[in-house]
């Protein structure tokens, strides 16, 4: 009887973790383009974060890398504070002028925006042109072409 309760308790824990994981990822939608590096990273947008005002759009983006990114570490575990598997950004896109600016940037030690986080420097006043065949161009196509 004790073994059966314990195994049911373990099963309930596994189911709860899976449900929580799915709900945490519920708003993230993969963005795929032929010009992205297949197998190296996956780009997602948070469909719940899309905000529109006039011809401007704001959106949260998550980039999940297959291999760890950042500077090489030192020591027995080769880890450093600047190593990460995923990043999130909050971007503001001007659809008419095809310009983008970064509002927030965070690196995460683990996949899908999990684990210890480190915020990066952002200059919200700096607008950049949206170059062809880039992540920003894919976001512009997704969010601005169908207005």
Report residues per predicted region:
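Helix-centric, low-specificity signal for extended rod-like, repetitive segments
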Residues: 1, 14-15, 84
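General helical secondary-structure elements
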Residues: 1-2, 56
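Bacterial N-terminal signal peptides that target proteins for export
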Residues: 2-11
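Bacterial N-terminal signal peptides
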Residues: 10-21
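N-terminal secretory-pathway/extracellular module detecting exported/lumenal segments
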Residues: 22-90, 94-147
């Amino acid at each position: 009887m004790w073994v059966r309760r314990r195994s049911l308790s373990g099963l309930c824990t596994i189911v709860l973790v899976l449900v929580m994981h799915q709900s945490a990822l519920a708003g993230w939608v993969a963005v795929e383009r032929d010009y992205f590096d297949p197998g190296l990273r996956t780009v997602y947008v948070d469909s719940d974060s899309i905000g529109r005002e006039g011809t401007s759009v704001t959106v949260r983006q998550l980039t999940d890398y297959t291999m760890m990114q950042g500077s090489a570490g030192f020591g027995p575990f080769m880890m450093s504070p600047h190593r990460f598997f995923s990043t999130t950004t909050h971007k503001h896109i001007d659809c008419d002028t095809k310009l983008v600016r970064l509002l927030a940037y965070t690196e995460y030690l683990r996949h899908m925006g999990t684990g210890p986080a480190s915020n990066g420097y952002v200059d919200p006043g700096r607008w950049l042109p949206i170059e062809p065949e880039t992540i920003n161009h894919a976001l512009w196509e997704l969010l601005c072409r169908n207005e």
